[in-house]
Amino acid sequence: MIVVDWHNGLIFYEFLWDGENRNLRKLGLKEHIWSSSPLYSEEMKKLRKKWFRNLKETEGFSAKALLDFHHNAGEGSRDYDLIIDRGFLKTQSISQVQNSEKELRFSYENLINKEFTEDYLQLRA
């Protein structure tokens, strides 16, 4: 889980559980990609990091580019691409949060029933 604190500057915290241990750490202000420890081998995680670095170098991290990355990144393997389908285990959804001076935008796409929801929280009048 990632926690973002906008009230005390911009601070990111990462809460990880690897199936055995829980860890909380403060993150630096740079880009990160996460892969569920119980679901992916170290080799699969390295591939995902490679795809993420490639995105940064070729398209950058706009909201549109990141959403497209979550839909399409991979090499055609339903076992370890960003959208997985291992039969019994499938990617359920894609969520995105965008913060601007005026609002916080949250979008949620249910990949199972193809529903898309978008909500806004106005930050300043």
Task: Place the predicted regions along the sequence by residue.
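N-terminal nucleophile
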Residues: M1-A125
